[in-house]
């Protein structure tokens, strides 16, 4: 019998709008403790019902003293539950409990060195008294509330951490959830285990049992359709749904003509033949390309592709009859990149944007609370072949957003062939599981070259390869020069109309992983 959430220790994170907020949830789950990101104005009654071991206030872009600043119900401080405030969360707790918060004369953005004033304080116990952290604030606490001690400081932030051990209230001005804070994970562990007394009793096996039970309760005897791309997200979604409801699921594999080389056939073999998922394959390449003619704006391309997907689903659903649910492989990172109630939109995501208002299906998103690496772990637990689980992340719009500008069949062929060479050589070099994501893009730039005895004026191919844990932040992958050189040689010699290769050495942020 599947367990309920009440059976697990949990720490909830209240969302005040930081783009890092879901990383906090991710880190807590890494410790084996269940965690969810919830609205900042979550009711006291709901908090009591959830009975968390601890509460974390996330960071955010507001100033606590401004009109319209995001707040919490003051009763939250009377629940007897440990609280950790991060950045804005620390300022809010200080402000609400009688401390002072003011605009900083010297703002801190980026790496900073803090000095731990009280090495015996619960959060810093056993850690170095000098450590680098990641700061991102324009305000600071200038007076701690009564009953609090200052436990850390930095050059521009005299009150960088505070503690009230009696009430188990703690605050840090820096972002412990970001990997740039060298002992950030230790600080979060101290809060979760030492302060909150939580027990690590949450596993992916538990998630499977709970999600299967939840899907069965929600779907009942109704039918579900799923848009299948062949990527990790949709493949794991299909397998999880198949485990829960069997043949009530029909996966609609919309081949929009923007897939990677041979991907369509590989999808059919792995999921339909080997795993038994019921799949209908729809060849819609011409339809999609006609809709994309003359379109160059990336947001518009995403919207068109998303809308066309749903229209295909509607048509296929009518053929199937009595379909009530549309499943999607939406992840936590998809949701945050499309903005939440408190976070600014970075770009509309293919899984959560472009849905028509008159959509005839109820939406079911069983992976919505998971990050990419958790999805891979889930896939392995479900018995999906290793090669499929570790397939490179692939956006719903496919190669359509890796061709910058207008999408044509000829341009898709260039990207598809160059991408296949890149993937083949990365695998030969044994780097396929060391690099989080890698692909080629066609920027639409032509340049002069010399091939044979003649002058050429052909396309440039960009190579993008990054290392990451969860897609929230990423660094460019340091592929050995000889491997990059060989990839370049092969692409310019084997792919028509290409005479130049460039390598993207930008991190996320400031760039996103995809170029569009």
UniProtKB/Swiss-Prot annotation:
Xref: Pfam families: GATase, GMP_synt_C, NAD_synthase
Catalytic activity: XMP + L-glutamine + ATP + H2O = GMP + L-glutamate + AMP + diphosphate + 2 H(+)
GO cellular component: cytosol
Protein name: GMP synthase [glutamine-hydrolyzing]
Residues where ATP binds: 229-235
Positions of the catalytic residues: 87, 175, 177
Pathway as given in its UniProt record: Purine metabolism; GMP biosynthesis; GMP from XMP (L-Gln route): step 1/1
Domain GMPS ATP-PPase per the UniProt entry, residue ranges: 202-391
Protein task: Catalyzes the synthesis of GMP from XMP.
InterPro entries per record: Class_I_gatase-like, GATASE, GMP_synth_C, GMP_synth_GATase, GMP_synthase, GMPS_ATP_PPase_dom, NAD/GMP_synthase, Rossmann-like_a/b/a_fold
Keywords: ATP-binding, Glutamine amidotransferase, GMP biosynthesis, Ligase, Nucleotide-binding, Purine biosynthesis
